[in-house]
């Protein structure tokens, strides 16, 4: 159960029990999918949600790992930070990766830890030449500790530290080359950033190292009003003065699916994950959305 391909679903607790029940009802076993198997090609799991945790969630993950291919996607490695990588975290992460038999591990090209403090956010790094090799060295150290190939994800951001020496896409290419790692391309993140910062997302894709893409993410986003007090109420898409937030709280919009189709023409078939973290609907609705994604890249 280790081939990761097609269209997968980011596993979330909101529908975990339903997924287990429906998978069991379909008669799926460790060796064969049942006649009524769910149209889920694989699952993506964030190990931090299961590490050092007892009870039904890790047990459910172990059960699902015998029935679906699983790939892991991290949240807290802080590859763009300067704090030392957490050795205990890497040991726990490696054990989880082995347990679910993930063929690679991805995490975000960002910093989320500073001076030992977890920032609970995925903050952008400076797109400077001096940052390339230190980040690449951290990616290679993580790869060696985990025992599987690494891939880095482009993040959404709403501010940027310092003056950039290159575009984000060029920076991703430099880091991937220096680290000899894969790219976990988040199509929605690139689209959201293009709206907020006014750049051409197709040019961004032309500069990105698409030859290194091993996996993609798609998700929904939402528009919010912005004023002197900060981010306010939701507004209609395209509203003047609005900001687009990568909430993972809505269906994947048509422009993101259209962009996905253009990108897949260049990359060829790669595993695609649907992410949903806010306003999570019933599993049936997520399966319908996955069908839209399949139709888009068919």
Predicted regions and their residues:
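Gly/Pro-rich active-site loop or hairpin
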Residues: 54, 69, 84, 122-128, ...
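Boundary/entry segment of secreted carbohydrate-active catalytic domains
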Residues: 1-23
